[in-house]
């Protein structure tokens, strides 16, 4: 395991079988080592894994654990090509501000907790901008932590494209904790 305590292993076949690729650091393109990915073992850290090279396409956040089939990480298929370690909040502090309009305009809600439904909790249909003041967060396009995922680090996001989304469809979010 690396000095930082991060390690992830990708396997071509289900249940940790077949050829495998180990990583303890960010990798922009590992698809040359594996033709597909059907299972993953995260031995240290929390990882963002991406469908395409250069950290593009669908992204999935995987905390420490075993994922014997791609459905276990909510994958759409067996294609993964890049990965990066997620840097978690030091001190365990989390704070997020979400806005109903772009450029931090309109109604603002501040939270330090996970939210399974922004409609139920904040009476908002979409998130058009946000400020991550503390910690790392995941936005989900559907309620109850489902659908496409977006990783947000500590910074300001003036519009959805800033966090990698094509639209403001954010229906739930949660803190990344280990």
UniProtKB/Swiss-Prot annotation:
Region span, Connecting peptide: 88-93
Modified residues (N-acetylserine): 2
Keyword terms of this UniProt record: Acetylation, Eye lens protein, Repeat
Transmembrane segments: none
Gene Ontology terms, MF aspect: structural constituent of eye lens
SMART domains for this protein: XTALbg
InterPro entries for the chain: Beta/Gamma-Crystallin (IPR050252), Beta/gamma_crystallin (IPR001064), G_crystallin-like (IPR011024)
Domain Beta/gamma crystallin 'Greek key': start-end pairs: 6-44, 45-87, 94-134, 135-177
Gene Ontology biological process terms in this record: lens development in camera-type eye; visual perception
Keyword Transferase: no
Family annotation (Pfam families): Crystall
Start and end residues of each stretch annotated as N-terminal arm: 2-5
Source superkingdom: Eukaryota
Family: Belongs to the beta/gamma-crystallin family.
Record text on subunit structure and interactions: Monomer.
Function text: Crystallins are the dominant structural components of the vertebrate eye lens.
Entry domain remark: Has a two-domain beta-structure, folded into four very similar Greek key motifs.
Record protein name field: Gamma-crystallin S
């Amino acid at each position: 395991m690396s000095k930082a305590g991060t390690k992830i292993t990708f396997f071509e076949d289900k249940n940790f079988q077949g050829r495998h690729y180990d990583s303890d650091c960010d990798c922009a393109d590992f698809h040359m080592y594996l033709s597909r990915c059907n299972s993953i073992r995260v031995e240290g850290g929390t990882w963002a894994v991406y469908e395409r090279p250069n950290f593009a396409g669908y992204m999935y956040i995987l905390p420490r654990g075993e994922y014997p089939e791609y459905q276990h990480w909510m994958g759409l298929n067996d294609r993964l090509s890049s990965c990066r370690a997620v840097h978690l909040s030091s001190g365990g502090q989390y704070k997020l501000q979400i806005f109903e309009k772009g450029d931090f305009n309109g109604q603002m809600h501040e939270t330090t907790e996970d939210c399974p439904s922004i409609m139920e909790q904040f009476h908002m249909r979409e998130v058009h901008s946000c400020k991550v003041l503390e910690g790392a967060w995941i936005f989900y396009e559907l309620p109850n932590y489902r659908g496409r995922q977006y990783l947000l680090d500590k910074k300001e996001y003036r519009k959805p494209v800033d966090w990698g989304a094509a639209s403001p469809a954010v229906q739930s979010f949660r803190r990344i904790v280990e």
